[in-house]
C-alpha cells in the first residue's frame, strides 16, 4: 500500500524496517519506527512502547520520489535523513511515497540478536534494535532485540524459526526467526 512520505524526513527510512504513521508534528506521514527517536518525536527501536507512541502499520518495502537533482522519478530501497525531493510534475507536490506491507498477519524473517528460549516463542513480543542509519544496499540491517520483551507493548511476536538450516538454532545468537506484528502493536487488524 502507498503512504505519503514527507520530503526531508528527520530520520532515514529503510526497506524492511517497521513503519508507523506520524501522530505529532507532520501528522499523517509515514515514518521509520526502528530509530530510537522517530520523526514525530516518539520512541522507536529497542525502547518502542505502543501505549504512548504511534502503532505500527507494517514494514517498509521501498520508496518513490522525484530526485531533487536529476528531476527524474526514482524508486529506492531507502531515503536518507533530510533528503529533499523534487516537485512531482503530475501532482505539484514535493512529497514522495512509501510502499508498505500492511497485512497485519504477514510473516517476516528477522535475525535475532541473542538466543531465544523455546518457551518464549508465541508468548512474548520483541522490539527491533535501534537503527543507527546502517544499511546493506539500502535495506535494513536491524535485528530483533531479544533482551527487551513484553507481550503487551513490543513490536513483533516470534512464531517459529525461519527453517534456514544454517541459522535455525534458537539457542544461538543470530538465528533467523519468523515474526508477525504483535497484536497490541499494530494499527490495523
Residue ranges with predicted function:
Residues 1-189:
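Surface-exposed, low-hydrophobicity beta-strand/loop segments enriched in small/polar/acidic residues
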Amino acid at each position: 500500500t502507498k503512504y505519503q512520505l514527507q520530503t526531508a524526513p528527520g530520520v532515514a527510512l529503510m526497506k524492511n524496517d517497521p513503519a508507523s504513521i506520524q501522530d505529532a508534528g507532520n501528522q499523517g506521514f509515514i515514518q521509520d519506527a526502528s530509530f530510537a527517536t522517530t520523526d514525530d518525536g516518539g520512541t522507536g527501536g529497542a525502547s518502542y512502547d505502543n501505549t504512548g507512541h504511534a502503532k505500527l502499520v507494517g514494514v517498509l518495502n521501498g520508496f518513490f520520489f522525484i530526485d531533487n537533482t536529476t528531476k527524474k522519478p526514482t524508486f529506492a530501497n531507502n531515503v536518507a535523513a533530510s533528503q529533499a525531493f523534487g516537485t512531482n510534475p503530475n501532482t505539484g507536490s514535493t512529497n514522495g511515497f512509501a510502499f508498505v506491507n500492511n497485512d497485519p498477519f504477514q510473516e517476516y524473517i528477522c535475525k535475532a540478536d541473542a538466543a531465544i528460549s523455546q518457551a518464549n516463542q508465541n508468548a512474548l513480543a520483541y522490539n527491533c534494535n535501534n537503527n543507527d542509519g546502517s544499511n546493506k544496499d539500502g535495506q535494513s540491517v536491524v535485528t530483533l532485540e531479544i533482551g527487551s520483551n513484553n507481550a503487551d507493548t513490543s513490536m513483533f511476536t516470534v512464531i517459529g524459526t525461519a527453517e534456514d538450516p544454517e541459522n535455525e538454532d534458537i539457542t544461538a545468537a543470530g538465528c533467523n526467526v519468523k515474526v508477525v506484528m504483535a497484536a497490541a502493536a499494530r494499527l490495523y487488524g
